[in-house]
Design a protein with these regions (language model features):
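Alpha-helix capping/helix-boundary segments
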Residues: 20-21, 72-73, 128-130
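Nucleotide-sugar-dependent glycosyltransferase donor-binding/catalytic pocket residues
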Residues: 40, 71, 152, 175-179
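Nucleotide-sugar donor phosphate/pyrophosphate-binding loop at the beta->alpha transition
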Residues: 45-52, 87-89, 96-118
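N-terminal strand-loop element at the rim of the active site
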Residues: 1-46, 144-146
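Short His-centered aromatic/hydrophobic patch
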Residues: 68-74, 92
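Conserved donor-binding/catalytic core segment of Leloir-type glycosyltransferases
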Residues: 161-180, 186-189
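Donor nucleotide-sugar binding/catalytic pocket of nucleotide-sugar-dependent glycosyltransferases
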Residues: 31-34, 113-159, 169-172
Length: 189
């Protein structure tokens, strides 16, 4: 829905590691540029290559503005857009494991502070993350926007009554991580 809304007034180009849906975006008339990225990787050579790839991408496209999602694009594109004076916006979906290890959290905090110096707005999917970024002096409250929700469009996907069976079959698709609520899920099951 975000992409469709942006398309009404802008040319939209998506640059990301595509793991499905690339063809759906192409059918919408969107240019898709695959980007190779290891989400959890910390190899300095691979990270330098990703930064160089992003730099080339900005030179090739010359965007009017950039919207980033997830930690690496937020930080790397934030740094590059700041240097090139390209307006940019960032979306923080969650803090992830980077903020659970004190040394890594300190390093990532410094990177975010530098990357978000000139960010227009940072969108958060929950208020706790926005508060954490404020407490760490990463981004001021006047540039924070907490989204009212992210996920399933309940207008399009209406809630259905449970099947009339004695057992409910439940399928969980997601990462088994404490910070994502896996303990609460196991307790509920």
């Amino acid at each position: 829905e975000l992409v469709e809304a942006l398309q009404k007034e802008h040319e939209v180009i998506l640059a990301m590691p595509f793991v499905g849906h690339e063809e759906d975006f192409r059918k919408m008339g969107i240019e898709c540029i695959p980007v190779s990225m290891n989400r959890r990787g910390v190899n300095p050579f691979a990270e330098a290559k990703l930064l160089r790839d992003y730099k080339r991408l900005l030179q090739k496209i010359s965007p009017d503005f950039v919207l980033t999602y997830s930690i690496k694009p937020n930080i790397y594109m934030g740094l590059l857009c700041s240097c090139k004076k390209i307006p940019y916006y960032a979306n923080v979906q969650g803090l992830g494991t980077a903020f659970q290890k004190p040394v890594l959290a300190g390093f990532v905090t410094v990177l975010y502070r530098i990357a978000f110096r000139k960010v227009k707005y940072v969108f958060f999917e929950n208020k706790e993350n926005a508060r954490e970024f404020g407490e760490r002096n990463i981004v001021s409250a006047d540039r924070q926007v907490v989204l009212p929700g992210a996920g399933i469009n309940l207008e399009k996907y209406k809630m259905e009554p449970y099947p009339n069976h004695s057992r409910v079959h439940f399928l969980y698709l997601g990462r088994i991580m404490k910070e994502n609520g896996i303990e609460e899920l196991f307790y509920a099951v």
